[in-house]
């Protein structure tokens, strides 16, 4: 009998931000394959005796290859196991979800996707600001600041990213933001555009700082911490 895979979004780190459905799947799973940022308190909800397998990827450290992760997921499911693939934030955002779904489809293994709180939503909630504003911030855009090499992705839509009326959230962008900021300014975005750096979102060491895109670029050029972070810039990226 073939098993089943639940892609479970773990949220940004605070276990109280898990959905009820996420907790239910963890409590019934035979195996949990978890990302680096999905470990810790979230895993306390896993069923006692379940296999807990770390498959996370972090910039600057050795990580499992994606093909290995997909193969492991298929192998567990083919034993008939109920498998949770635990992904940080919302698993549909920058989580390489499609590649793992493709592997399951090729093996005729069923799956479901359980949404969760993305770190962008958790960050603005912690900062006490909204993502949108009537008339002046009508659009939200998410972009990754790193490709598979760790550099800034090619082919970015700079006209969209330099829109002064949008709220832009940059995931995994600390290492490349100095370059991105210069590109934004070259495309007409004011260096005084408000920006927010949110590190360790919804964890005990959470830190939120306010900048402009120019001052944030300078700040990050001086050195960065190893904590996961996101960057938000636009008209709402300032302390109310």
Sequence positions of predicted segments:
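A short alpha->loop->secondary-structure connector
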Residues: 105-108, 131, 186-192
């Amino acid at each position: 009998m073939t098993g089943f895979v639940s892609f479970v979004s773990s949220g940004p780190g605070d276990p109280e931000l898990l959905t009820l459905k996420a907790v239910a799947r963890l409590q019934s799973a035979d195996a949990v394959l978890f990302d680096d940022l999905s470990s810790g308190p979230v895993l306390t909800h896993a069923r006692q005796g379940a296999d807990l397998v770390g498959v996370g990827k972090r910039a600057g450290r050795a990580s499992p290859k994606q093909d290995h992760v997909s193969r492991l997921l298929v192998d567990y499911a083919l034993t008939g196991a109920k498998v949770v693939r635990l992904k940080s934030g919302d698993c549909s955002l920058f989580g390489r979800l499609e590649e793992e779904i493709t592997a399951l489809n090729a093996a005729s293994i069923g799956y479901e996707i359980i949404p969760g709180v993305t770190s962008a939503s958790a960050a603005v909630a912690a900062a006490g600001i909204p993502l949108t504003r009537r008339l002046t911030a009508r659009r939200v855009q998410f972009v990754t600041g790193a490709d598979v090499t760790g550099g800034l992705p090619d082919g970015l839509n700079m006209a969209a990213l330099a829109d002064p009326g949008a709220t832009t959230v940059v995931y995994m962008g600390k290492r490349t933001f100095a370059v991105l900021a210069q590109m934004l300014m070259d495309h007409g975005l004011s260096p005084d555009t408000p920006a927010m750096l949110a590190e360790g979102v919804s964890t005990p060491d959470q830190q939120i700082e306010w900048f402009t895109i120019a001052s944030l670029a300078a700040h990050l050029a001086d050195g960065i911490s190893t904590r996961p972070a996101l960057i938000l810039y636009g008209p709402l990226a300032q302390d109310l």
